[in-house]
């Protein structure tokens, strides 16, 4: 929704991962944490494709929103390097909300057609290995409380991101 409102191309890790595996984008495909489609090697391949697509968009003068976890500093630094290479502004949008909201949303999403296969257990494992964002300058790191609905959050985010961070 955000990318569409801003007129930015969206590259989603969930959609890219499933495309690489030859799966329909909204077909749920559950595997053990860091196995199969979610193994370190397949995850690396997924991020390589995300960066490839983003590079093409940026070099054609477009703007791109990378919708992915970016749980490690190394991946975020790789994205920042790509932006520098394309002479594009790099912004990190970190989404935060209470765990009870996260759990409820993940449980509800399990019954819907969705790109994402993440469930509560995946969230808990991701949380344990998440590397705090310390490598991005504060004026390029936007922390957003996403407790509210997308509809409620969108206008403020579009205002803030439409002209970059100030």
Q: Language-model features: where?
A:
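Conserved P-loop NTPase nucleotide-binding/switch module
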Residues: 70-71, 79-83, 88
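Conserved nucleotide-binding/hydrolysis micro-motifs of P-loop NTPases
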Residues: 15-18, 70-72, 96-103, 148-150
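Small-molecule kinase domains that catalyze NTP-dependent phosphoryl transfer to phosphate-bearing small molecules
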Residues: 111-156, 165-166
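Helical mechanochemical/support elements of P-loop NTPase systems and associated helical scaffolds
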Residues: 12, 42-46, 75, 102, ...
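Loop/turn-to-beta-strand initiation segments
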Residues: 60-64, 89-91
């Amino acid at each position: 929704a955000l990318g569409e409102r801003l007129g930015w191309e969206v590259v989603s890790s969930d959609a890219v991962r499933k495309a690489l595996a030859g799966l329909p984008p909204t077909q749920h495909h559950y595997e053990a944490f860091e196995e199969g489609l979610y193994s370190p090697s397949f995850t690396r391949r997924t991020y390589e494709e995300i960066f490839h697509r983003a590079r093409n968009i940026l070099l054609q003068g477009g703007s791109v929103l990378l919708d992915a976890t970016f749980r490690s500093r190394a991946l975020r630094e790789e994205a920042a390097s790509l932006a520098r290479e394309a002479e594009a502004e790099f912004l990190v949008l970190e989404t935060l909300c209470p765990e009870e909201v996260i759990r409820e949303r993940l449980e509800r999403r399990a019954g819907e057609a969705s790109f994402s296969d993440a469930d509560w257990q995946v969230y808990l494992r991701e949380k344990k290995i998440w590397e705090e964002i310390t490598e991005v300058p504060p004026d390029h790191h936007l922390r957003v409380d996403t407790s509210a609905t997308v509809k409620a959050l969108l206008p403020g985010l579009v205002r803030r991101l439409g002209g970059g961070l100030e």
